[in-house]
Amino acid sequence: MEQVNIFWFRRDLRIDDNHGLFQALSAGLPVVSVFIFDPEILKHFPNPNDARLTFIHRCLASLDQEFRKFSSSLQVYFSSPEIVFGRLATKYSIHSVFTNTDYEPAAITRDQKVADLLRAKGVEFHSFKDQVVFHQNEVVKTDGMPYTVFTPYSKRWKEKLAAHPIQFFESEKLLHNLKYLSSDYFPELNEIGYNTQNIAFPSREIDEHLLENYAGMRDFPAENVTSRLGVHLRFGTISIRKLTVFAQQYSEVFLNELIWRNFYMDILWHFPHAAEKSFKPAYDHIEWLNDEQDFERWCTGQTGYPLVDAGMRELNETGYMHNRVRMVVASFLTKHLLIDWRWGEAYFAQKLLDFDLAANNGGWQWASGSGCDAAPYFRVFSPDAQTKKFDPHRYYIRKWVPEFESASYAKPIVDHAFARLRALETYKKGLK
């Protein structure tokens, strides 16, 4: 039986500057590349028309086409990782399995199970840093404790980067070390219960001009000055290392956004309870109203507040929402409507193409006040004030809520002044 190494693709669907793939291809044995559609993960994608599955499938097909240039192919499975690796162990003499580290709580548990299974069979399991520039224990306080405030974390992060310049891994130059695998078969998406969507996804190309104007225009939702790279960062079709170097050259503000991403991943690693509960436990005592009709109006963009409704309609139609508007709609749900942040977090998780557990959780807990380094509970965004400041000509609103000046437009779901006072009283009571 031929001895091989295996590379397990997950949130790293690219061949260039892929750390784990580089290590696998450098280890001296032919490499079998695999991707696993795990039913435990897919249960979080209940909509058969979820465009994220189309994105993943296209990425896998692209990888497969690249590998065929080297007389190999990507092996795609639909099963649990434990079952897949059990089968692969009967097909090959596996020396090692290589992959890139996933920092989410469920992924950590999964990888430990797989590592234990493989080691019981005498197979080594190697995981590498690829999703982030610095992993959870590299940017910490002098006493080794994690940061829970962004500004000192960011300062320390940049100091580390200056002291340890980024190293690239030229995995794309080693594809000749893939194992020869002749196969004309590549699975269709409908074989795992999903329908292919006719959708144009954002480019993964980095726009230098956009980044040069990012700082001054990023808060204006009508302007096309955001990178739209979130989906590529989520599924690893772009290298965080390359993107960081690019940001260093063109935009300090954009670099800070990448650091926020790293920060929230570190928070989730060190404080896994935040995935389901408030980072600050006292906030779990807030008595939410959780009115289902109000929630439905928020979801469908019928609150009577044009900026909120524009954001929700954009999300529902495109799977994207401008970051400034994300803050406004999240604040509105949690403070104007007094609906648990977890309801909004879950809705975003179903709708966002770029959904990332750490970033989504961190953003929602920031807006509700329950997170680390969050907006104070008494900061209640005024949708009208935000509109005047960031969409003064209503270009963004007119695109998504064309009826907003007509009699047919929904009446405000709640008065802003009343909602603000109610939120302050509710938060004060819950935080006693």
Located regions from the model:
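Trp/Phe/Arg-rich N-terminal binding region typifying the photolyase-homology
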Residues: 1-161, 250, 313, 425-430
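Hydrophobic alpha-helical segments, especially transmembrane helices
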Residues: 11, 112, 262, 325-327, ...
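Residues within alpha-helical segments
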Residues: 25, 312, 345, 417-424
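A short alpha-helix capping/helix-coil boundary motif
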Residues: 40-44, 63-66, 92-95, 164-171, ...
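Glycine/tryptophan-enriched, flexible segments
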Residues: 123, 145-283, 386-432
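Active-site-proximal binding-pocket segments
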Residues: 225-398
